[in-house]
Amino acid sequence: MKERQRKQRMTNNLIWAGVGIGVLAIIGLFVWQAVKTPPPAEAMGEVIPIASADHIPTGSDPGAYSSDPPAGGVHYADTLPAKFYQESEVGSLPVHPEAYLVHNLEHGHVIFWYNCAVLTDGSCDQLKEQIQGVLDEVDGVKVVAFPWESLEEPVVATSWERRYSFEAFDPEIARQLVLANRNKSPEPNAP
């Protein structure tokens, strides 16, 4: 009888020890996750105040934005596909493509606006390859490259309420910008 009680006590002790180890493992997992997960990076670039984010009728003139290129503001109800747009494609797009692209920004996209005309050394193809390389590295998710003739710099990146100017395009900074700014917007869960 005593032997049976001793075995029962030992079994109970082993069960409680197993439960205790399991609880400690779960607590350890939560602590490890909290320490391992870095805080979200602060968005990069100059802050651009947005007066309104209202939808306007498709085809209507969105008017002047608070920055050039825009970092937010009034926009159409539709977006443009996330991709690299060549200068030759702009003429086939609907009127005021910026009003579609501002809606992309509201959905958390990052846009690299580029102007090859300001490059004096004929390095447009290299610039486009570098921008495309960044798009490829982030799998093109919520990233657009778009030609913009009014730029005084070769590239300006915008995200919702942010503007970052590149005097010389740096792919590493561009990648960091995408990671820091993507989805920091009013509608980050929209496609």
What are these regions (language model features)?
Residues 17-30:
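Hydrophobic membrane-insertion alpha-helices, especially the h-region
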Residues 77, 123-128, 156-157:
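Short, well-ordered strand-loop elements centered on a beta-strand within folded domains, enriched
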Residues 1-19:
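Terminal, Lys/Arg-rich, intrinsically disordered segments and adjacent short helical elements
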Residues 89-137:
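Mid-length scaffold segments of soluble, non-membrane domains
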Residues 38-100:
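Surface-exposed, low-hydrophobicity interaction/linker segments
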Residues 130-191:
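Helix-rich interaction surfaces within compact, conserved domain-sized segments
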Residues 27-39:
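Membrane-interface motif at the C-terminal end of an N-terminal transmembrane signal
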